[in-house]
């Protein structure tokens, strides 16, 4: 065999790019915090019991290697922007997109804790859609751009009816309305699990912090991000395409612009749900 060709083959073996984020992936992990390992030198944030943070860290993930599917069953392209997929349905309509997925996670958390009165989201016209009113049989009607409640059904606090409520919200709320509801996080040093980078608009986008860890020697925090996108698709844990060695983790160190695979945010876009 030609010596030059052998050298070429060896070059492919030893110099080909690898996927560093695989160093942090435990294929057998069944939740966010067991699937994505923390880099050396960092300690995972321990969320308080029954908090939104604990809920997200413990959220189930689909089998390693699962592809993100769109609402119509087609595979998302590009395929190289995520490392894991959350085990939650996307529905059969093109509704659960960017901000919708975040509202879904927040609502699912509150529903699972029977904190029904805290489930409410604003429509883009400013109307507040309270889950408890919906579950008690009230329905929302529209006259022009004005929304109002009418009593039209019996009370139903079932999970199926909860999903009906969310579908209604996804139809009339989005990144623009959610951005106005959330409160601003003043400093990246204060970021928490459950915080959201969001830009309201048409289109706008939003990603949520699923997990976080802190440096053992500095105030640096690293974090995982998840998103849905357009069209509606499975919620996915994003790669960090700007830092292959740290990916899928992101860092708040010297962060001015947050570049994710499919959207760019400013540090001032960080917000959170009001408690």
PLM feature segments, named:
Residues 5-7, 199, 215:
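Generic marker of residues within folded, mature protein domains
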Residues 76-192, 198-206, 211, 218-230:
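Acidic/His-rich structured neighborhood in mature extracellular/periplasmic domains
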Residues 53-60, 109-110, 166-169, 225, ...:
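Generic hydrophobic, helix-prone segments enriched in Leu/Val/Ile
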Residues 1-3, 8-23:
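Bacterial Sec-dependent signal peptides at the C-terminal "C-region" and cleavage site
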Residues 18-89, 93-96:
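Cationic-aromatic interfacial patches
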Residues 221-275:
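Low-complexity, Gly/Ser/Thr/Pro-rich intrinsically disordered linker/tail segments
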